[in-house]
Amino acid sequence: MPTLKDIRVRIKGVKSTQQVTKAMKMVAAAKLRRAQERAIMARPYARKLKEMLGSLSDKVDTSLNPLLSNRSEVNKVVVILITADRGLCGAFNTNIVKLAYKLIHEDYAAQHSKNGVSLICAGSRGFDFFRKRGYNIIKGYPGVFQRLDFSFAKEIAETVSGMYLRGEADRVVVVYNEFKSVLAPVLKFETLLPITPEASGKDGGSDYIYEPSPESIIDVLVPKHLNTQVWRVMLESNAAEQAARMSAMDSATENAKELLRTLNISYNRARQAAITKELSEIVGGADALKG
């Protein structure tokens, strides 16, 4: 049975941990507000670019742009993995790494068996996991979310588009956590290349007038669309990470509170038992003197 001193030491340790988790929750909440704003603001722009690309694809021969052209065979795959730089965010990193692992070993098992799967890792957790296991990592961006900037998204987009154009990749997919709510990030994977524009349809689509020509505009719009999509998923992942961390630290703080309650009860019981024992010894000693 633990002594009073042992329980006091443990209570002190739990209180210290509770202060840390409470502070981390407040920091994550502050970061979440800004990250959420950035993610939500990026969505309409990315959506509009996608809509314009769909409208243009109805008017031009998409096979003329190699980034819009499907390959007859998919032998080389690039997986862009977006994870966090730090832990203490629940199952955020574990779930996304599991999804990427499943994607590589099930969906692209044939390509993986021939060393045809490569990785680009944004975030330290995914980078460390796959690097230690000997996977082919083309580029790693550990620490990227400490100084998140559009230039990183542009660099990743230019890397994968260059690989696709040179025939070093037949498909590029991105795996990330999409921010939906504080309690429920959504695991997602999307195909970035080849780009598949959504058909606008004959009715209901916007009737744009293009100058100088749809062909010249689509050549400019395609790389811009790719840059924007990579940037959007990075913003979504960052917001989802802060939400997951805030939720995890809130749970940890509540668990510490419950543990303190249990420890205080144990402390009081042990203290009462010690007092009772001392009283019994005093009474026993007094009786012995009388006898």
Curated annotation (Swiss-Prot):
InterPro entries xrefs: ATP_synth_F1_ATPase_gsu (IPR035968), ATP_synth_F1_gsu (IPR000131), ATP_synth_F1_gsu_CS (IPR023632)
Q: Where in the cell is it found?
A: Cell inner membrane
Q: How the protein sits in the membrane?
A: Peripheral membrane protein
User: Can you name a GO cellular component term?
Assistant: plasma membrane
The UniProt family comment states:
Belongs to the ATPase gamma chain family.
Subunit structure of this entry?
A: F-type ATPases have 2 components, CF(1) - the catalytic core - and CF(0) - the membrane proton channel. CF(1) has five subunits: alpha(3), beta(3), gamma(1), delta(1), epsilon(1). CF(0) has three main subunits: a, b and c.
Q: Mind telling me what this protein is named?
A: ATP synthase gamma chain
